[in-house]
Amino acid sequence: MTDIVDELKWRGLFAQSTDEDALRKALADGPVTFYCGFDPTAPSLHVGHLVQVLTVRRLQQAGHRPLALVGGATGQIGDPRPTAERTLNSPETVAGWVERLRGQIEPFLSFEGENAAVMVNNLDWTEGLSAIEFLRDIGKHFRVNKMLTKDSVARRLESSEGISYTEFSYQLLQAMDFLQLYRRYGCTMQQGGSDQWGNLTAGLDLLHRLEPDASVHAYATPLMTKADGTKFGKTEGGAVWLDPEMTTPYAFYQFWLNVDDRDISTYMRILSFRSRAELEELERQTEERPQARAAQRALAEELTTLVHGAGQTAAVIAASKALFGQGELAELDEATLAAALSELPHVRVAEPAPVVDLFAEVGLVASKSAARRTVKEGGAYVNNAKVTGEDAVPAKEDLLHGRWLVLRRGKKNLAAVEITGA
């Protein structure tokens, strides 16, 4: 088996674990059956989940057997957040989200061979459990004073919101998952984020009590952070989702393309499957020519392909180039163009209007007089064609797919106009 621990550490994917020597030996002797859980608290995974999803993939490629758990039971409860109670979703809603998340996780894993992945749902062993059975068989083995010390619980107890018994009990449900997976599949390792460490160790404690001969482990990845202090995975428009209907492939690609130079080396190591030599070369290029954004482009292309497929990546790259004058906008299919333009400032008008009016209305300039100056200075473009006259009005035949105009001021300032009455 591949000794994966050093690789995980080099990539910045190793925050903490139970006895590291024992874990290292188990992974070296392998294969280890391990699990990672994903709660369906929304209809899609977001980019923050990629750390876990891709680490599961990485461990499977090293020869280990993954159990990907989508929490049809725990998703109805919700892991305690630092600030407030979660909104409870109906069982029907959660069940629908379980299927959506399964569909997003499955393409990252292999379901063939000796270490074939298995998708599991903790509702299978929780739904038929009575309250009496749960309290006698699971709750009996936990001590409240220890449960109160878990970070997720302690933070809530210090807040004015407090914590409900429902969310307080979440760690018991997650602990039961580890017990069930050990008994059903021989699972001996649990993987999660470092913010889940209290829940991971709760599972270990339960196994040690009920299966004292079991040799089991827990391993946590660090949380993704940003150099500017803002939350990873968020934009002005909200979370960056893996579902293409919630975040377009174009917006997904642009999210990675716009990663801060201070963060890109860290993100590349954590998320990319490129070799050390390739990553070190990209780090060197970033240091020497940060304006080229070679590492950002490489990561954006790799992750967009993993999540959305090579075809979507090619379309997104073509759209990105065309928007900035390095390709033909007219050659983009309507769906790709519309997705790209949806991420830009845009206005809707009934008929084509003078270019200076459109530039001012969409906010590319502060006023019509500023728009005229931009035209005079040669910095105004419509569909990548330079505007040469202050009184220019786009013709209907100029509209992309019969309804779109792409406005650009200078090299980087873009906006879109949709003509509704064309």
From Swiss-Prot:
Main location: cytoplasm
Alphabetically ordered keywords of this record: Aminoacyl-tRNA synthetase, ATP-binding, Cytoplasm, Ligase, Nucleotide-binding, Protein biosynthesis, RNA-binding
Residues holding L-tyrosine: Y35, Y170, Q174
Substrates-to-products reaction catalysed: tRNA(Tyr) + L-tyrosine + ATP = L-tyrosyl-tRNA(Tyr) + AMP + diphosphate + H(+)
Enzyme class, broadest EC rank: ligase
Gene3D superfamilies: HUPs, RNA-binding S4 domain, Tyrosyl-Transfer RNA Synthetase
Residue positions of motif 'HIGH' region: 40-49
Molecular functions (GO terms): ATP binding; RNA binding; tyrosine-tRNA ligase activity
Keyword Protein biosynthesis (UniProt): yes
EC number: 6.1.1.1
Residues annotated as domain S4 RNA-binding: 353-419
ATP-binding listed as a keyword: yes
One of the GO biological process terms: tyrosyl-tRNA aminoacylation
Residues that hold ATP according to the record: K234
Domain of life where this protein originates: Bacteria
One CC-aspect GO term: cytosol
Similarity field: Belongs to the class-I aminoacyl-tRNA synthetase family. TyrS type 1 subfamily.
Assembly, per entry: Homodimer.
Protein name listed in UniProt: Tyrosine--tRNA ligase
Gene that specifies this protein: tyrS
